[in-house]
Amino acid sequence: MFFIEFNVKLARSLYLCLNLILSVLYSYITVKFISVYNFPIYFILLITTLIEIFIFLDTSYFRILTSIKTKYFYYILIVFSVVVFILKNNINLYYVLTFYFVYYLLISIVLLNYNLFVIEKSKSIKAGVTDISLYSNLSKLLGFSLGSYIYKVNIDEYLIVFIIVFVLFSSFKINNFKNETEKDSEKLVFNKLKRKYIIINTALLSGAAVFFIPLFIKQLAARNIIQYSSIIFFIPGLTVVLFLILTKKYDINLNRILMFYIIFDILFFILVICEVFLPLQVILLSLIVALGVSISIKLRTNFIKINDKDYRKSIVQIFRISAPVFTIILSFVGLYVENIAYYILLINAISAIHVLYVNLRNREHTLLD
């Protein structure tokens, strides 16, 4: 048993490790579903979003799983991993689905507790939200960068690593008490939330990368240079991480970020329509994604500050589901509307203009408060 004081630094490290596991797992499952079972890529997004919605409902109303101590989730994950390892010779669609569903559900609940702890115990709410976003994007960058090698690794090798990690984490003394972030939040009364439009804005500012990266990949395939596809994934992620590191050191005015976001969004729209130099499109998209994440951090920080602290756990989960839900809705719309990606750019610009308008109109109570 390791006796370690639970602090923000350790919580961030655990958050990074668990998020990295989910990112690697997401890459592995995506490759499996596309290459073996011929499922559309959005099917994985649908599964993860439904899980996140369940966690939100459980956090806000049911309290079935989210009231359980963190250490017990590690025990469950260890037992489940051992069972999955024993049954590894019977891999089929249901095996893979169950494997992903259980892992994503349990790890996401643990991440929610660590997420809330970092926000509560950091020197400021903004610092906590920025740290969470930085570590989340860093883990995705590392996890997705390994995506091209995922199919070469057997599932039992993953399971051995996972079991070792969960045993190690469960042995920490920090998980043997119920910290305050694991407590039940008050049942959410949605009408009591202030500035609910922030939820919509943060959702609308996301999604560009989800739709444009596949389009870029298609362009590479058409030019017979698909081997460079990993760069398309890597550059936006790296840009986000570097920009978040920059914003941790320097406080950049929200209105300036919004104006640059709107300008880049419109410029990117023109370049895409005119099919201008692909590398330039990738760079501009990366900047748009990075600025969008920065805007989202400021909006989420404001929303957490102005609303009841008893709802904080539910609020954190709201922001985990808002963007995926928006993406899924647009994905279904895209089945009937051609060039949906172009409309998303217009939606992004309109959302940013709305936030800028609200911020300029209410100078005494800006979204920076």
What are these regions (language model features)?
Residues 2-52, 194-232:
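Helix-loop boundary and gating motifs at the non-cytosolic
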Residues 16, 94-110, 280-296:
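Hydrophobic core of transmembrane alpha-helices in multi-pass small-molecule transporters
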Residues 109-122, 293-308:
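Intracellular juxtamembrane helix-capping segments at the cytosolic ends
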Residues 137-148, 323-332:
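Glycine/proline-centered helix-kink
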Residues 157-173, 342-357:
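Symmetry-related core transmembrane helices of the 12-TM Major Facilitator Superfamily/SLC fold
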Residues 258-296:
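C-terminal transmembrane helical hairpin of 12-TM major facilitator-type secondary transporters
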Residues 310-336:
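A late C-terminal transmembrane helix in Major Facilitator Superfamily
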